[in-house]
Structures are given as C-alpha cells and as structure tokens.
Amino acid sequence: PVGAGASDLRNETLRTLLREVRFAAIKGNSSEIRFLAGEKATARGVDADQGVLVSEDNLVASARMAAELSADTGAVVIVSGRIDIVAHAQKAWAVSNGDPLMTRITGSGCMTAVVVGCCVGAAPTELPQACLCATCAMGVAGEVASENMAAVGGGTGTYRSMLLDAMSTLDGPAITCRAKVKYIL
C-alpha cells in the first residue's frame, strides 16, 4: 500500500482492493498500515509519519493493531521500520534486524516487498513463517551490507549495491544465525 493515507486516489484504490482481493500478505510502513487498519495516520508521500514509528514504547500496541488488521483481512501483515512487526491472526513477532542506512536509500521497502512475495510464493502453506523469513532476510542483508561498506568506505550508492550483493549471497544458515525475532502476542 505505497503511500496509503497520502492521497484520496490512493486511499480509494486501496479500499477497493481490500474489498475485492484476498491478499496473502500486506506490507507497509507504520503510517500505511495504520491507515489500512482504520487508525488516524498521516504520510509524507511514501515515508512514514515519524510520530507513529514502531518503538519499544509502542511495540505491543503496534503489534495488536497489525494483528487486528491481519484478522480482518486474512493476510499476514508486515509493518516495516527500525523494528519490524509480522502479524498473523492474533499472533505477532518483532524483528530487530536491519541498519539505519536502509532508510537513506529509496526503495528498500519495495525490495522487502519483493522478498516477501518470493517467500510467500515459495511457501504458500506457511505464510507467517515465509513473511518472517523474508523480513529477517532483508534485515540481515542490510546489516551485512553495512559491515561490508564499512570495510571499503563509500556512501549510499555503495550501500545500495552492497545491499543487493548481500541479498544475492544470503543463505538460510546466515539468516538463522543472525535473525533477531521476538514473540510479542
């Protein structure tokens, strides 16, 4: 739901899609997901409102909101941010992988959505696990890219390339070893 809450056209299109399509997964930033959940949310284009970002202080409340949207839509709901939330039915997990540089490049959220789609397609009968794996994979790739960039120097262009490289060389054991997942609900 890129830019949900940012314009009337996007909002009406999203409402129509939610009525007419059964999604396996819905991924968005905190503003986008709050809008879809019917909560007051403001967005600046595709960027989340800084006042509603998921934090340790609002983690449980944010997880409940995502879990309720999941129960309403039947989809796994992924809230992306410094702390990601993956919710399905009345369960939710926090994923604390990633790197602050991910917020400084355009498209990291869209990259995550692509990884979610790939994992959902690969494991359609295990949707919560697929979405958790995708979310962890993207975060771990972000961490690896940051570590690799620190070794050679560079800026956000270098980071973007190293993020793609990290994702292309990531494997299951690396994700399992580095995943930072906490059960919330």
PLM segments and residue spans:
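Glycine-rich nucleotide/cofactor/substrate-binding loop typically near the N-terminus or early
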Residues: 1-6, 166, 170
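Short, small-residue-enriched loops and turns at beta-alpha junctions
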Residues: 2-7, 85, 102
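Electropositive phosphate-/nucleotide-binding environments in soluble metabolic enzymes
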Residues: 7-11, 30, 59-63, 110, ...
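Conserved phosphate/ATP/ADP-binding segment of small-molecule kinases
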Residues: 10-92
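Short, well-structured alpha-helical segments that form the helix of a local strand-helix-strand
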Residues: 65-70, 127-141, 160-167
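Short pre-catalytic strand/loop immediately N-terminal to key active-site residues, enriched for Gly-Thr
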Residues: 95-106
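Short, small-residue alpha-helix embedded
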Residues: 104-136
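Charged C-terminal helix
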Residues: 140-185
